[in-house]
Amino acid sequence: MKGEPIESVKVGLEAMVSSLRTDPFALESANISIITFDREVKVLLPLTPLEDVQLPNIETPESGPTHTGAALELLCKQIDKEVTLSTPEKKGDWMPLLFLMTDGKPSDLQVYNNIIPEVKKRHFASIVACAAGMKAKVEPLKQLTDQVYTLDTLDSSSFKQFFKWVSASIGVGNRSIGATDDLVLPPPPEEVNVVI
């Protein structure tokens, strides 16, 4: 993702953080982490309480591979390190929500296929995948989750609507790890298409 699309993602992230900061419950319970994946996989923002989030600058290469599998491996390590499970003696963290956005397909397909069962073992309240742009492939995302969406227009208005929906999803997704009911997300905006 380069140029206007990545700038639009940045605007959308800023709008999401601003929106969440107006929700007193989110201020007390939401934490945000950002992992980027292209030819390098990086934790740009470790799991950080919402009130302390300073969005980092997201830089992308001109072109190159999309290491989605390596990103999910790093995600599993970060979840294991940063998220506290509930025990009989101690209340744990809220169940995390995973929002994965890609404008391509996994370049490291074998790693991607191998890590999917590990991701599913983690205690996510929901895993939502977004195929952004016409070159994004939904088939690999459907292996990860049933909740796959497409965003065909990569402008700031579309990304703002997408991240507004993400904010609303975070609001309904704050549940303790160990809850068993499926999370029902709010309906997506018209800019976001459901993949069936």
Locate each region found by the language model.
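Von Willebrand factor
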Residues: 1-45, 53-94, 97-101, 126-140, 151-161, ...
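VWA/integrin I-like adhesion module and closely mimicked acidic/polar interface patches used
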Residues: 7, 86, 104-143
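Short, well-ordered amphipathic alpha-helices
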Residues: 13-21, 74-84, 113-116
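P-loop NTP-binding core
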Residues: 18, 86-90, 193
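Von Willebrand factor A/integrin I-like adhesion domains
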Residues: 134-185, 189, 195-196
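Short beta-strand-loop
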Residues: 28-58, 138-144
